[in-house]
From Swiss-Prot:
Purpose: Allows the synthesis of deoxyribonucleoside triphosphates necessary for the rapid viral DNA replication. Phosphorylates dGMP, dTMP and 5-hydroxymethyl-dCMP (hmdCMP) while excluding dCMP and dAMP. The phosphorylation of 5-hydroxymethyl-dCMP represents the first step in the replacement of cytosine by hydroxymethylcytosine in new viral DNA genomes.
Entries under Pfam families matching the protein: DNMK
Keywords: ATP-binding, DNA replication, Kinase, Magnesium, Metal-binding, Nucleotide-binding, Transferase, Viral DNA replication
Residues binding Mg(2+), per UniProt: 42, 85, 108
Name of the gene this protein is made from: 1
Name of the protein this chain belongs to: Deoxynucleotide monophosphate kinase
Amino acid sequence: MKLIFLSGVKRSGKDTTADFIMSNYSAVKYQLAGPIKDALAYAWGVFAANTDYPCLTRKEFEGIDYDRETNLNLTKLEVITIMEQAFCYLNGKSPIKGVFVFDDEGKESVNFVAFNKITDVINNIEDQWSVRRLMQALGTDLIVNNFDRMYWVKLFALDYLDKFNSGYDYYIVPDTRQDHEMDAARAMGATVIHVVRPGQKSNDTHITEAGLPIRDGDLVITNDGSLEELFSKIKNTLKVL
């Protein structure tokens, strides 16, 4: 099973490339942002159950029939509450270093130092709170920058190893947004493919939307024509793997 990591800014054709491979080859897909969406969908469900906020399911966090840039009009205190719940969800999947303590009855809670760190990070963010901004805050501003830089890579590695002998020809990771994630992928023997649309730049200033550098050994698909031309380039690229 060949491991492929895709990279590209918004609207570069990266997701179209992943979908084409999934539809036309024996392939399985893993999203690094999948656990982020899972955790926030769970946390939102707990939070919104006692408020007048709208119901947002996993589908909305995936962006299906929903604009993830929509302002949710959350206060910072409400965001902190959501993040606490998201941390609890994630810790149940794979422990987050230095976050949780247990009381005499065995009940789990966020420790004082970790809570202060979460609070400080959220209080220093002045952006409007949308689904996308919640994802960036949990995935990068909190977990990667303050608790465990390799946390999302570890979750990917567990899934990859579980599927290693599953019979698929390709294992696709379509949403790599940080250099350390891509470095880990290269170390694991992944083929890195950058999908580039000339002149396409992201207006999102968050680090996860800045695009990644092309390293020696990486492959590049230039998406500068029709869909049919893009599909032809994908086929030709996969032939050389």
